[in-house]
Amino acid sequence: MKRILIFSLVLLALMTAGVAAQQTYSNDKVEYTFDIPAPTWRAILEPDAAHQNPEFVYGDRLDGYLTIRKEVVDAGTTPSQLARSDQDLKLRFLPGFVPGKEESFNGRLDGVTMSYEYVRSGKTMLGRTYYLQADNRTIYALRFTGLRDKLSRIRNQTDVIARTFKLK
């Protein structure tokens, strides 16, 4: 009986520690919130008069870098259409660009993800953008970049950030 009680207390402590590690990002100058799944994520740029969009890193910029942009689009534009437009007009000009696949994505806001690879300073980088539809004229683009191997390892964390992204 004593072992069961000790095991239960240890299990409860571990579950509480896991929940406590997750924080919610919110700022008065942005219209959204999302969960930050690990303390390794930190804001390097907060919104102010000069910068409208926050930026985050996972330890180091090469390990994981996140920018969030609000895209105002024509009525009826889908996240998939915006993803293809970004690829055609912006991403394909990156050095060593290799397009990835587009996948549907469900969270508090639904949309699509687009993955791609490119080269920066001789290193293979991975980009993964979540296009999340807020309404028929607003799509939020959560752009993650980092070294291919390192960003791939934290895919579950990028998914958590995108899944918990919601409007205030």
Q: What is each PLM-predicted segment?
A:
Residues A38-A43, I139-K168:
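Surface-exposed amphipathic alpha-helical segments
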Residues L45-Y140:
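Conserved polar/disulfide-associated segments of primarily extracytoplasmic proteins
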Residues E31, G76-S80, R148-N156:
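Soluble non-cytosolic domains of exported or imported proteins
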Residues M1-I4:
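Positively charged n-region of N-terminal signal peptides that target proteins for export
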Residues V30, P39, E71-V73, V119, ...:
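Solvent-exposed coil/turn segments that connect beta secondary-structure elements
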Residues F7-T16:
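Bacterial N-terminal signal peptides
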Residues Q22-H51:
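N-terminal "mature-domain start" segment
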Residues A17-A21:
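Sec/Tat signal peptide C-region and signal peptidase I cleavage site
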